């Protein structure tokens, strides 16, 4: 939940005054990543100048650069890292020439982006959501208890601001990194298909399925915890309504709700976009296969014609009679021109008439709930109706019952923003999700 206390002109003037700049060609970035990797293996988090030179030597060898000027180039690279505030240098008068180097927050942030944040972990996300859920519950309990301004700052505002908001930002960063990974997968698939699409089919399928699985796993984890998180945020928001001096808490809760909604919404939208891309790739592969078949046949036919005098051949072809479709798509199921007139005893009653009669009966029966002001549980009512009809009519009957029920009134629980529980309505797996109608 980033907030800037300075204005844009102040930030620009500050950056210009301090001469901030970052320039990291691929070899310098590789050197920084090597330093971060070696630094992570040390307990004290410190590196000497000799260790930095050794790391630079590895990078120089990987880029096939000359080793004659390794000392000068390593010294220039280290000084450049210090100037760009990627490394901090600490010198001592007792040990002159043996400086100690530590990565700055900027250096850690850049290397963390390229190294640690590249891996998606469901366990890590689950732990983050578990921590957020615990913090939100404690904050909601503290909000329900109430107290003075110090109580709200210490037990409600602080956990939301410095724990929940930062974890939400971390999850948002994970989503943005996965956006980049999707683009990288698309580039890899495009390169595979441009080289040899036959050999690339299995690799493309693997990349598509892995990315789809990762996106779905992330979204399922978010949706499973999203309702509980929103419920606790609503508890805090309800507790602040009676206090005019807690606008800072209310504004923070609103920002967190928007952030959570945006995270879950973009997760689903990202899945939908990836499904569209998946279909596009499969359509391209199918088209390529069809075109390649025609191309191979044309090439073989051309070679056969060119070598006819050396290897004569005969062409046999078959031209079967075309099968005509005798079905009239516009013909009604029981058109009088086809079936003739039926006796009155065999007249078929159209489904629309049956539906109107059934709707009238159900409307009359459901009106009892409104007259008595009794709560109407759609799950139980629909299940009772479906038990009276064959399975083939369950969908139509359930739709009629629900249409008539929602005309009678609304459920006050709908205004809380919490989803209703799924209730089974028949023995074949059908379920309905609806609050009890209690306001007519």
Curated annotation (Swiss-Prot):
Residue ranges crossing the lipid bilayer per the database entry: none
Major localization listed first in the record, in broad terms: cytoplasm
Gene Ontology, cellular component aspect: cytoplasm; nucleoid
Name of a matching Pfam family: KicB
Locations listed in the record: Cytoplasm, Nucleoid
GO biological process, alphabetically ordered: cell division; chromosome condensation; chromosome segregation; DNA replication
Region (Leucine-zipper): 208-236
GO MF annotation, one: calcium ion binding
Highest taxon in the source lineage: Bacteria
Subunit architecture: Interacts, and probably forms a ternary complex, with MukE and MukB via its C-terminal region. The complex formation is stimulated by calcium or magnesium. It is required for an interaction between MukE and MukB.
HAMAP family hit by this protein: MukF (MF_01803)
Protein name: Chromosome partition protein MukF
Gene name of this polypeptide: mukF
